[in-house]
Amino acid sequence: MPRFVTALLPLLACLPLMAQATDAQKKFAGTWEAKFKDKVICTIRLKAGDPISGETAGCSINVDENGDLKEPDSADRPDDPSPIFNPKIHDDTLTFEEKDGDEVLKFELKVVGDGQAELRILNSPVPLKPIHFARK
């Protein structure tokens, strides 16, 4: 077999895997918003790439003792976007981390329908119900 063809075979074998990675990222790429009483309480912006990247902005998530969302305190809204770290996609789920001062928060964003997702804070000090996000 000619050398060119031999060298090309491994590249061709990787194409389906690259296409799968791109398709998985497309599920998540875009701007996602969580709302409470028609007000945006958190925005997640994700960009497809190698690896997927993004940031959270304006997130003010407050819950009651049952883990249900409650009215956010307007003074709690952070001004600057926070970059996400260690993003990993597995099927319909994106896990990522975000630094909050000295703390590292761990998140899981799961696509549950067309333009619909649920966010879980994996290491929250209080139990939280999934937070609904819609792609903008």
Model-predicted segments: where are they?
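Residue-level recognition of beta-strand termini and adjacent short loop/turns
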Residues: 113-115
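Central antiparallel beta-sheet cores of small beta-barrel/beta-sandwich binding domains
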Residues: 21-106, 120-131, 135-136
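Extended lipid/amphipathic-ligand handling interfaces
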Residues: 109
